[in-house]
């Protein structure tokens, strides 16, 4: 009987420890996602930013994460071994960087309309980083090669007038 009781006590201890660890560690893992509204889809009417939930401390982590994700998406385009096409180059580039675009749209609209010292500090810090980020994409020789292939073969693609115009100006 004693072994049976010890076994139950050990199981209860393990369950208690696991429960404690889960309850203690899970908020640490997900706290950034739960607290930063940029890291989730907007659950507002018309998907407008939830301005009442956004504060200045959300911007830098969202900008940094947005640039990281954007770089990953651009690297996927570069590493794509398929024959370059309008879809896998131009459309993929246009669709990339959605988090960065969302954060930038909110931040720069706020900085232009209701600025404060904290917003100005963030703007001063993030502007050169964004410039460098976008320059690294625009001046990337691998992206340039792929776009050049498309541009040189523009007449071989079945492009709409809009797609043709986009490619001509890329």
Question: Which role fits each region the language model picked out?
Answer:
Residues 31-170:
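Zn2+-dependent metallopeptidase catalytic domains
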Residues 4-17:
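Bacterial N-terminal signal peptides that target proteins for export
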Residues 16-27:
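Bacterial N-terminal signal peptides
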């Amino acid at each position: 009987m004693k072994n049976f009781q010890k076994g139950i006590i050990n199981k209860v201890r393990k369950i208690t420890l696991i429960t404690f660890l889960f309850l203690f560690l899970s908020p640490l893992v997900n706290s950034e996602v739960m607290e930063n509204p940029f890291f989730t889809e907007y659950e507002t009417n018309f998907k407008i930013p939830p301005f009442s939930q956004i504060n200045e401390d959300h911007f830098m982590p969202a900008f940094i994460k947005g640039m990281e994700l954007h770089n990953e998406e651009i690297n996927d385009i570069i590493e794509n071994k398929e024959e370059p096409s309008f879809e896998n180059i131009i459309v993929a580039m246009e669709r990339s960087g959605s988090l960065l675009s969302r954060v930038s749209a909110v931040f720069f609209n706020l900085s232009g309309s209701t600025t404060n010292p904290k917003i100005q500090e963030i703007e001063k810090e993030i502007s050169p980083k964004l410039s460098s980020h976008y320059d690294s994409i625009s001046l990337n020789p691998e992206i340039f090669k792929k776009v050049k292939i498309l541009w040189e073969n523009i007449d071989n693609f079945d492009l709409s007038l809009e797609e043709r115009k986009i490619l001509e100006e890329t």
